[in-house]
């Protein structure tokens, strides 16, 4: 089930909210857990068993990994933590990468091993990382193990963030599982944030995504150098508004139920470097790899050479996490190399040039990165880069490119503005100057308008999944 579907908006969500708020507080986690299972089962009923099994493993290993338990054997917490790592990484490797490894082995060794054709359980990359971080944090003594299985199961299955993040760590919501802010004001903030996210996805991401699909599926004879760049720029906007839209919707839904999830995006396209970009993009994933991979490997504490190696390991794994395909690994290595260069020498040089050129530098390498990310077919990927850099035998620009530019010019201008802090600053100024009008009239009116327009878009379009669902 998609957040951006009429079934979710006008059936599932109202039923959940009504049920949640009419039952006693003590049973609300149970309501969330049951409806989260329904939400997950809507698309993949078979894999509910897998998610529940992961929760049971996390519950048991969490109890055993808690070093603060009395009469605990010396090595039990370590063994429990290792068991959780093996289980979660094993699940990911089996369901997400088995066919990739089989294909790679067949290509390298000339074997003919048949692929298993496994369907990827939706959300497995996210809930595996969440349960893994829970057990590791318990082992490190940063949080106590959860004794109530229902509370832990609610945390793992919580439908607002189950499918595509943000990666919510247990330590950030542990107290909220017992007591949370279920006020009218908090609920209204959630509706506002959800409306913004829905508009980002349905109105902005889907619209510019049509341009990327059109260009990427066009015949070579219809393209130009400018069109190839236009296509990747379209994808650059699409993935941001699609994914940040989902995160906004998840955060908004969380607020409707009293939860406060951490932010996942902070205007990444206003970055002045790639280092800055990765502090702003998918922040929950970046911080996860920092805390559970980079720092345990030694971080920057074991010399410059070891730090460089650690950075490359982290970025290879970041690319690998995104999907079982070579382009994702290349994408991870690409950003790893740039980050290394910025850390070793490029970062200092960037600070000496005007901020405008820092932005241009960052955007150029961000767009090229999405060019790698967007094509899983290596042949199409290489052909597109040939086209982009004038090696594909294409004209610089043609009539078809001019048509696309004319057709999407207004959309692109809106996307550029929406990628900056300008809309937020304007809203803040309005709230300061006219707090009553803004809070009581303008904000609710804008939210309702977004919901109405988004619904109209949904009525005229078919299935439109979020891009990050496949990861």
Language-model segments: which ranges?
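Membrane-embedded transmembrane alpha-helical bundles that form the catalytic cores
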Residues: 1-470
